[in-house]
């Protein structure tokens, strides 16, 4: 495992069939992050090398670092790196009710300029299939970001939930609210 501080340049590791996956976590979420990583590796193709990058704002405890190492040490086809982003996040306004880990995914092109493609995953989900299926999906190269429609939000917008309609129309000012995406699984190109 490697640890990087603010502003460090990170390059993809020198392996064949690399799949780069980024998560953002706090100390309180490391147990969930370990489960997410374990599920990626358990179901992932043994032919691929998983380049796992965990973004964080506060230093993790040694116990938390040991937990992540225990999980990744079970597999020989992964690299784990921790990237501190606290200085980068200081420059941005963050709403009080939303964790900064939610916002950091939007900075991935800036944080990882040496990457052509990364998958961003929330650090509290379980991957039940080989994530290489998502990695190798053909995508139009004019696209910067791919995500899945957030059917719950779209349903609220189209239904009787006035506050959601107001939020999307007047706060977010989305011109196509039916294309609102869920941000827990994203592909950046």
Cite the ranges covered by each PLM segment:
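Glycosyltransferase catalytic domains, chiefly GT-A lineage
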Residues: 1-189
């Amino acid at each position: 495992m490697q640890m990087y501080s603010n502003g460090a340049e990170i390059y993809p590791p020198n392996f064949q069939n690399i799949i780069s996956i980024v998560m953002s976590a706090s100390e309180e979420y490391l147990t969930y992050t370990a489960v997410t990583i374990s599920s990626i590796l358990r179901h992932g193709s043994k032919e691929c090398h998983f380049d796992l990058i965990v973004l964080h704002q506060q230093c993790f405890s040694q116990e938390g670092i040991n937990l992540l190492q225990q999980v990744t040490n079970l597999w020989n086809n992964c690299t784990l790196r921790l990237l501190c982003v606290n200085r980068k996040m200081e420059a941005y306004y963050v709403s009080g009710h939303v964790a900064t880990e939610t916002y950091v995914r939007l900075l991935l092109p800036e944080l990882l300029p040496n990457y052509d493609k990364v998958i961003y995953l929330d650090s509290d989900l379980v991957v039940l299939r080989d994530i290489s299926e998502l990695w190798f999906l053909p995508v139009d190269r004019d696209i910067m970001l791919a995500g899945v429609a957030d059917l719950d939000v779209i349903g609220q917008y189209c239904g009787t939930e006035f506050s959601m309609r107001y939020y999307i129309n007047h706060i977010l000012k989305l011109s196509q609210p039916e294309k609102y995406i869920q941000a827990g699984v994203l592909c950046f190109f």
